[in-house]
């Protein structure tokens, strides 16, 4: 069976509305792509992660009247009358296999690998985290996750306690445990993330050393040797007082989910409490790390 695809550019704000509308008028699937044509496979728990200008890509049955689809979109007022779009025919494929083929084992730092379950482990002697794309944000494919994993690999986590603030899939907490941490604590606002983290921890044999809490249920006076938060710049600034208290004196802090253009404002929220390192950038994203002063 052949398909026809329409691709149109949208603002972040309107992308989900357009997606819902396209599904209502017959799209068999709708995906989001960023401006670099990279599929966004990693939704935050409870929402769709979008950044920059977003392309909405919808797949229809090949017999669909695409002129009518375009006309209906215009009438919906979700797009401008002269909105740019591209329509192309798509050959039939084994889409599940195509999707799986896009994921490969990835190395972070010197020791750490993230491996999909259907791939052969490249180095059995390395620190291997088995993780499949699934319920929650975090598989290693996004630059912010990569920045955080590389940082964790650089630390001596032996017998340390690590807090993963905004744990998503649990990838960072699980990686920390596999890298030698004694205990990890994952905190997230969404129950979906807690479920995903628990499942992934069980697959990796570290569930007995991982505690998980919804934000509203987290214990008072939590504190750790290492705190990592891969969320977004806004929450990192708003929640700075809370995040700062989670780090022991002389403990390590790692922050990401931050665009390079937002780094300065995030640093200002933490610089009085931490001796901050040089900012590390990857593509348009960055990582902020530091050691707590007291």
UniProtKB/Swiss-Prot annotation:
<keyword id="KW-0949">S-adenosyl-L-methionine</keyword>
<dbReference type="InterPro" id="IPR050078">
    <property type="entry name" value="Ribosomal_L11_MeTrfase_PrmA"/>
</dbReference>
<comment type="similarity">
    <text>Belongs to the methyltransferase superfamily. PrmA family.</text>
</comment>
<comment type="function">
    <text>Methylates ribosomal protein L11.</text>
</comment>
<dbReference type="Pfam" id="PF06325">
    <property type="entry name" value="PrmA"/>
</dbReference>
<feature type="binding site">
    <location>
        <position position="188"/>
    </location>
    <ligand>
        <name>S-adenosyl-L-methionine</name>
    </ligand>
</feature>
<keyword id="KW-0963">Cytoplasm</keyword>
<dbReference type="InterPro" id="IPR029063">
    <property type="entry name" value="SAM-dependent_MTases_sf"/>
</dbReference>
<feature type="binding site">
    <location>
        <position position="166"/>
    </location>
    <ligand>
        <name>S-adenosyl-L-methionine</name>
    </ligand>
</feature>
<keyword id="KW-0808">Transferase</keyword>
<keyword id="KW-0489">Methyltransferase</keyword>
<dbReference type="GO" id="GO:0005829">
    <property type="term" value="C:cytosol"/>
</dbReference>
<dbReference type="GO" id="GO:0016279">
    <property type="term" value="F:protein-lysine N-methyltransferase activity"/>
</dbReference>
<dbReference type="InterPro" id="IPR004498">
    <property type="entry name" value="Ribosomal_PrmA_MeTrfase"/>
</dbReference>
<feature type="binding site">
    <location>
        <position position="145"/>
    </location>
    <ligand>
        <name>S-adenosyl-L-methionine</name>
    </ligand>
</feature>
<feature type="binding site">
    <location>
        <position position="230"/>
    </location>
    <ligand>
        <name>S-adenosyl-L-methionine</name>
    </ligand>
</feature>
<dbReference type="GO" id="GO:0032259">
    <property type="term" value="P:methylation"/>
</dbReference>
<protein>
    <recommendedName>
        <fullName>Ribosomal protein L11 methyltransferase</fullName>
        <ecNumber>2.1.1.-</ecNumber>
    </recommendedName>
</protein>
């Amino acid at each position: 069976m052949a398909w026809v695809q329409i691709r149109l550019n949208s603002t972040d704000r309107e992308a989900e509305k357009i997606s819902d509308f396209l599904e209502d008028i017959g799209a068999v699937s709708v995906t989001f792509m960023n401006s670099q044509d990279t599929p966004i496979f990693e939704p935050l728990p409870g929402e769709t992660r979008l950044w920059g200008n977003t392309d909405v890509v919808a797949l229809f049955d090949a017999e669909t009247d695409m002129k009518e689809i375009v006309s209906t979109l215009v009438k919906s007022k979700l797009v401008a009358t002269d909105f740019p779009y591209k329509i192309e025919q798509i050959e039939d494929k084994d889409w599940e296999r195509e999707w799986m083929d896009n994921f490969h084992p990835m190395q972070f730092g010197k020791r750490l690998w993230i491996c999909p379950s259907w791939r052969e482990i490249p180095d059995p002697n390395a620190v291997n985290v088995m993780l499949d794309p699934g319920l929650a944000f975090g598989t290693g494919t996004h630059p912010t996750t990569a920045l955080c994993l590389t940082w964790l690999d650089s630390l001596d986590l032996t017998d340390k306690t690590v807090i993963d603030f905004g744990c998503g899939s649990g990838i960072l907490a699980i990686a920390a445990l596999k890298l030698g941490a004694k205990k990890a604590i994952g905190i997230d606002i969404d129950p979906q993330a807690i479920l995903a983290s628990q499942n992934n921890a069980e697959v990796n044999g570290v569930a007995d050393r991982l505690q998980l809490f919804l934000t509203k249920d987290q214990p008072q006076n939590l504190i750790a040797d290492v705190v990592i938060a891969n969320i977004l710049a806004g929450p990192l600034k708003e929640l700075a007082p809370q995040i700062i208290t989670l780090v022991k004196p002389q403990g390590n802090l790692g922050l990401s989910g931050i665009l390079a253009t937002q780094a300065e404002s995030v640093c200002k929220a933490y610089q009085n409490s931490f001796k901050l390192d040089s900012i590390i950038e990857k593509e348009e994203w960055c990582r902020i790390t530091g050691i707590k002063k007291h």
